[in-house]
Amino acid sequence: MSTTHSTKDFLLNQAQNTTTISEKISCYKKIIELDCDDPGAFHSLGNVYSAFDQGKSKMYWEMSVQKYEKKIESFKDSASKYLKQPDTAKSSEIDPKDVFQEIGQCFYSLGEVYDNLDEYFQASEAYKNALKMDSAKVFCLFDIAVSLYNDDKFKESKKYLLEFLSKQSSYQAHYFLAMILAHDGSVRESLVEFWSCIDESQDDSLSDWYKARSYNNLGNVKLAEKYLVSAVQKDPEDVDLIYDIISFYEANGEGQKAYEYYEQIRVKKDTLRLMKKTM
């Protein structure tokens, strides 16, 4: 392993293990200094900045798209040249399956960035390509479905959700299927899927959010509130969750409760404004 690769690995581990945002940013920027074509570093910088500087996060995500596409083309060219070689010239250390998996991972990461940029058609296409490169990535079926759902392509999204659920259980997939069925007017079927989402969910913040949304669609406001509150308590740094519970209280005419969460947002915004100035 080259010195550059070992240094990059060290910086990547440091970035992933630290809880300090400034240190994460510093590590990823150092990786870029070592390798300006590393798409993962740009991708990760976009993720970090998304908490407090939308302009910078968008910039880094867009740069990562260019880097991922460049890396994919490089892999394709290398794979094409390798496959054209006579068998006697091919290295036994190279497994074509590993190359396809590597390309597939690049496509998957590209899909994640497109999702972050709200470019859902491009995201779904990237996930489809990831699945073509590595059929073992069954979870791509779910990501394709969600991107299509966000792009209002409900019929195609439903197809991928059903295929995904035929291969593995997923409370999140049940939720999106329920939403599509409700949109199509299949009320009874959608209720079954909302209950499946609730029954199969776990005991974490994301599960509680899905339970809250499902109970709200089932008309049980008290349980919807219970799980929204629980979701925020388990992940108090997630600003989107706090906005969700504010919207919930406002929709149900509970302005005082909404105001209490607005205060949490105000405090967080003050902190984020300071971070934006210093980073």
Residue positions per predicted region:
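Canonical positions in the second alpha-helix
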Residues: 30-31, 64, 96, 129-130, ...
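Short coil turns that delineate tetratricopeptide repeat
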Residues: 36, 69, 101, 135, ...
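Register position in tetratricopeptide repeats
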Residues: 50-51, 109, 116, 150-151, ...
